[in-house]
Regions:
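Extended, intrinsically disordered, low-complexity segments
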Residues: 124-125
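Active-site-proximal loop->helix
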Residues: 110
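Alpha/beta enzyme core
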Residues: 1-77, 84-107, 117, 121
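Active-site-adjacent loop and "lid" segments of alpha/beta metabolic enzymes
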Residues: 113
Length: 125
């Protein structure tokens, strides 16, 4: 299958009994469509901001998506999270969970477990 569209997501939901989280959502309309297709959560992410230069900032769309989906629908968030303050911002804007990627991976690659530990300390509140 060369394309993943909304019909594919609906069919996947029918076939998959486990939790289904859709990552890469950056618009209210897509988030509402994901919810309508039966996904268990939306993962707001720009995949590191390296896909489209003109894509909206994840933190900008997060509160809009939270408002549209309501207070109880699970929202995961990443993109541009570099310290504890960024985590607080995402939580205040409506995220239920904040995910980390590159900062920890880069630290692990540069200095092994010690580097990873130092990176995690940067995220302490």
């Amino acid at each position: 299958r060369a394309v993943a569209d909304w019909e594919f997501l609906k069919r996947l939901r029918e076939l998959w009994p486990g939790k289904l989280v859709v990552k890469g959502i950056t618009s209210v309309s897509d988030a509402l469509q994901v919810q309508e297709c039966g996904a268990d959560a939306v993962y707001i992410s720009t995949h590191g901001g390296r896909q489209l230069d003109s894509a909206p900032a994840s933190l900008t769309v997060l509160p809009l998506i939270r408002q549209a989906l309501g207070p109880d629908y699970p929202l995961l968030f990443d993109s541009g999270v570099r310290n504890g303050e960024d985590i607080v911002k995402a939580l205040v804007c409506g995220a239920n969970m904040v995910m980390l990627g590159r900062p920890v991976l880069y630290a692990l690659a540069a200095d092994g477990a010690r580097g990873g530990g130092r990176a995690v300390q940067r995220f302490s509140l």
